[in-house]
Structure formats: C-alpha cells, structure tokens
C-alpha cells in the first residue's frame, strides 16, 4: 500500500502533548511511525564516547510519533486534511479529499 504521508510533507499533530503543532516530516519509519521536526521531543541521557568524539550529557531529540496522530496540512484551505489516491495518465497520485487538489 502506498504511503499517505511521505517525507517532507507538512503535517498537523492531532493528538498528544504537541497537539495543534505544524511541522515537516523528516523520516517515515516502516513501523507506521514518523519522525516530525520539533515534535515529541524527549531527553536522552547520553554516555560520552571518546572514540567517536561524542560528548556526554542530556540531549534533546525527536522521538517517533504514530502516523494516525498526524494529518497532512492543506495549504489551500489552511487546515488538516485527508489524502486519497487516484490514477492520472497511468500514474498513481495523491490528492486532498476536501478540494481534490493534488498533493505537491
């Protein structure tokens, strides 16, 4: 099945501590989760590793968020939207359900 949300898509968080935030998807994981820039930040306690030149300390990083908790942002309507698929010229393309415009 083709992915409704892909890398570089702008999404709106629908649930969780970052509800309402708008950001870009930086990575899509095969487990049905996404890593979204600046969303779901967690603090990781990192050990120093002198061989790799990594300093120790508390590092803030993005944790994966469930794909069902985000919706793609439609810039034409200014709201979160759903995505559908259709064939155009023999190619499968994504479109917004609210206004039938193609997703860029």
Curated annotation (Swiss-Prot):
Source taxon at top rank: Bacteria
Ribosomal protein among keywords: yes
Similarity comment text for this entry: Belongs to the universal ribosomal protein uL24 family.
Statement: the UniProt record of this protein carries the keyword NAD: no
GO cellular component: ribonucleoprotein complex; ribosome
Residues of the signal peptide: none
Stated role: One of two assembly initiator proteins, it binds directly to the 5'-end of the 23S rRNA, where it nucleates assembly of the 50S subunit.
MF terms (GO), sorted A to Z: rRNA binding; structural constituent of ribosome
Lineage per the UniProt record: Bacteria, Pseudomonadati, Pseudomonadota, Gammaproteobacteria, Alteromonadales
Name by which UniProt lists this protein: Large ribosomal subunit protein uL24
Listed PANTHER family: MITOCHONDRIAL RIBOSOMAL PROTEIN L24
InterPro entries assigned to the protein according to its UniProt record, in alphabetical order: KOW (IPR005824), Rib_uL2_dom2 (IPR014722), Ribosomal_uL24 (IPR003256), Ribosomal_uL24_CS (IPR005825), Ribosomal_uL24_KOW (IPR041988), Translation_prot_SH3-like_sf (IPR008991)
Subunit structure: Part of the 50S ribosomal subunit.
NCBIfam families on file: rplX_bact
Gene Ontology biological-process entries: translation
Annotated keywords: Ribonucleoprotein, Ribosomal protein, RNA-binding, rRNA-binding
Pfam families: KOW, ribosomal_L24
Family annotation (SMART domains): KOW
